[in-house]
């Protein structure tokens, strides 16, 4: 892939990670839809809905990505996989939606985390210049202005945009304390 740039990809992955944390806190998971695989989006949607149902808000703020690096690239059949490590520091705590009382965590304490992010795309897809500035304003299949639906489909042509068919999507995210 001659246009692939590790530097641009890591900048893209940082942006996705920060958007993910903001969408989680704001409970606006549809904002992360273009960047996650169908399976991961469903998993995260269910987890977020549990917080909403129990009237709790998981606040993740003051996110600072300290370091990123690529771990591995593999191609298996019709899928390419990129794994990377992201080290970040943030505030992470849970409050009661109504009273704003802190239920878990400490809003005054930094949490140092190490994440493994797994991105996938269809084998053979080539990086297009500027994809580090991924936009959801146009469908990569038909070019129509679009808002991606919760099913990940273009509302005009019906193409599933979030499968990695056209570009990298986050398919897994694992984190643990550390730095």
Language-model regions: role of each:
Residues 23-25, 45-52, 71-80, 145-150:
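Short, charged low-complexity intrinsically disordered segments located at boundaries
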Residues 81, 99-179:
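Short beta-strand edge/turn micro-motifs at domain boundaries
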Residues 17, 53-58, 67-71, 102-104, ...:
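Sparse, context-dependent recognition of short Cys/His-centered cofactor- or disulfide-binding micro-motifs
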Residues 1, 13-14, 65, 94, ...:
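Generic alpha-helix detector with strongest preference for long hydrophobic helices that associate
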Residues 1, 26, 53, 61, ...:
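Acidic-enriched, low-complexity/disordered segments with a strong bias for Aspartate over Glutamate
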Residues 53-98:
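Surface-exposed, charged secondary-structure patches
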Residues 37, 89, 124:
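Residue-level marker of positions within ordered structural domains that often coincide
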Residues 1-62, 141, 155-160, 176:
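Core segments of small alpha/beta cavity-forming domains
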